[in-house]
Amino acid sequence: MKVEKTNLEGVLKIILDAFEDYRGHYVETYNEGLYNKHGIDIKFIQDDISVSNKNVLRGIHGDQETWKLISCLEGEFYLVVINNDENSLQYKQWESFTLSEQNRIQILVPPKFGNGHLVLSERAIFHYKQNTYYNPDGQFTILWNDPEFNIEWPIKRPILSERDKVGHFVD
């Protein structure tokens, strides 16, 4: 396992090791002791999976208290992480990553950050661990095309949920 800093303070890129042979491959997706050795001391208490088809864009969602560990179990998606912490020097900055079942990348997203993903393959399975239980009342939704961020999405007309169509612009 390799852990790398990203351009956003607090966001980490984790590249998982794989054991491969003629039968296929094996990947350990989480081991608390190993993550602790890399300075990631977060107690995750909820896991969620989202299955989406090509051109579906989910997000940008976040809250004030949740750490998320995001990975792709199948397919490929374009992930955007946004710093939504008004007290941060990096407020409104974003970074993108491509996650796939082949590259075995995980992204650790801190509280006060938002994330959204666009499915690039025919289908993708998005998996994330959280250190808090989901609280719909504490969520924020930022519009995927908010001009304040000028995010470079590789699509002009994604498939969106009603929630994501009515997100808000950031002032």
Where in this protein do the model-derived segments appear?
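Non-catalytic, conserved peripheral segments adjacent to functional cores
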Residues: 1-102, 123, 128-171
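Conserved metal-binding segment of the jelly-roll/cupin
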Residues: 99-122
